[in-house]
């Protein structure tokens, strides 16, 4: 079973892959791209604070940095996901800390 901490990078990778393929001209349903994007935020809400410590490979750090950059221009509509105690900006900052920090 994959927990939220380790599923988030898979969703990020799927979002980036589908976004790149769509940009390259492939017909990709935007709903599929949006689903992976929003899933990252859904899964973030499921993280347990004690789970937030791990060492991730450079490929995951790179993907997460690209995701965070792309996500700053998009809205996850957190209220529709039942997330109303934290902002998207704070979630992105926390994702950066979790997946990209050198700790």
Segments (PLM) and residue ranges:
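Catalytic cores of NTP-dependent nucleotidyl/adenyl transfer enzymes across multiple folds
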Residues: 1-73
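Long, low-complexity C-terminal extensions of enzymes
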Residues: 65-103
